[in-house]
């Protein structure tokens, strides 16, 4: 059964469809429509969440809730085969246009008719809605267990989502899923269709679903437009947390940069990061990201100069072209 993501707008979807139908480059469109919603769906900076990740070139990836294909086109460059699932025909049409090398499937997210198993499964801003489409006593745990059935033996599930206790929500940002102030901080009172989680809450869900090998990443300033990918190893040591590129109307209750410095000194940054990117691994073998402790992404320059810098667990620093 299709469900309504609270941030969706039918008029905006029609505009996005028309833009995608007529353009392959959205630079002029974003200059004219310099609003968060257009950047969220069309900006190339959306790719930065995964542009650094060492996907297996010969691998396969399933993106559940691919939206308007804002990440799908990147995945087709990273792996051999990409499947994208959406629950509305209009979204499927947009994805097909933006990521022509992907296979797009119109499907409910809890009734996926695929026999193939994948190396990677990606959910970005979708897992939070599992209680809307999984009818069970424990929808989030049960949905993770359901997704395991589509993974290869050493596969990975990625969850990209906001932190219910993200610092920006205390500082005056509206919660993206509800367009309300403090809805997550206050525990989603009277909101039954969606919820985000604190670090301990999402960790409990992951543990209960039987995952014993997983890694938290902390995209800063958020997972929509990340410039820095922190990990538990260095999040409180390297105090650079990036600068938010897109700020909608908001209340400014305090200086987030200053409080971020305090949180780092108190070893608390991982609990108040605005977002999580979580790598859930189905085996206990070594993974290529084990030694990656910090990634800084630079894609705001001419394309030929785009790079990402990695600090590794052995102390080495590498710079790689994008």
Describe the predicted segments one by one:
Residues 1-22, 303-306, 311, 316, ...:
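N-terminal auxiliary segments of SAM/dcSAM-dependent transferases
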Residues 77-103, 108-110:
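Class I SAM-dependent methyltransferase SAM/SAH-binding core
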Residues 68-79:
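Conserved SAM-binding loop of SAM-dependent methyltransferases across substrates and taxa
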Residues 138-156:
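A short glycine-rich, Lys/Arg-flanked "PGG" loop and its adjoining helix->strand segment in the class I
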């Amino acid at each position: 059964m299709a469900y309504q993501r609270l941030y969706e707008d039918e008029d905006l979807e029609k505009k996005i469809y028309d833009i995608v139908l007529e353009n392959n480059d959205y630079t002029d469109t974003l200059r004219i429509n310099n609003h968060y919603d257009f950047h969220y769906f069309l900006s190339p900076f959306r790719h930065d969440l995964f542009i650094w990740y060492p996907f297996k070139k010969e691998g396969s990836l399933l993106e559940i809730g691919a939206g308007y294909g804002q990440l799908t086109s990147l995945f087709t460059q990273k792996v051999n085969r990409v499947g994208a699932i959406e629950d509305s025909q209009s979204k499927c049409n947009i994805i097909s246009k933006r990521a022509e090398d992907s296979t797009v499937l119109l499907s409910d997210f809890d009734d996926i008719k695929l026999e193939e198993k994948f190396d990677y499964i990606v959910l970005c801003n979708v897992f939070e809605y599992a209680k809307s489409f999984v009818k069970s006593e424990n929808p989030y745990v049960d949905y993770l267990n359901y997704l395991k059935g589509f993974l290869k033996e050493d596969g990975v599930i990625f969850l990209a989502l906001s932190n219910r206790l993200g610092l920006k929500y205390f500082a005056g940002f509206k919660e993206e899923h509800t367009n309300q102030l403090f809805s997550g901080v206050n525990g989603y009172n009277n909101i039954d269709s969606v919820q985000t989680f604190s670090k301990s809450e999402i960790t409990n869900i992951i543990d209960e679903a039987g995952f014993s090998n997983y890694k938290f990443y902390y995209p800063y300033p958020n997972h929509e437009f990340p410039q820095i990918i922190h990990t538990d190893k260095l999040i409180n040591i390297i105090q650079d947390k990036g600068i938010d590129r897109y700020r909608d109307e908001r209340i400014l209750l305090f200086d987030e940069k200053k409080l971020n410095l305090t949180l780092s000194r108190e070893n608390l940054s991982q609990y108040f990061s605005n977002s999580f990117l979580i790598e859930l691994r189905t085996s206990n073998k070594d993974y290529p990201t084990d030694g990656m402790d910090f990634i800084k992404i630079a894609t705001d320059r001419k394309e030929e100069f785009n790079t990402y810098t990695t600090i590794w667990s052995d102390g080495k620093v590498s710079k790689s072209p994008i």
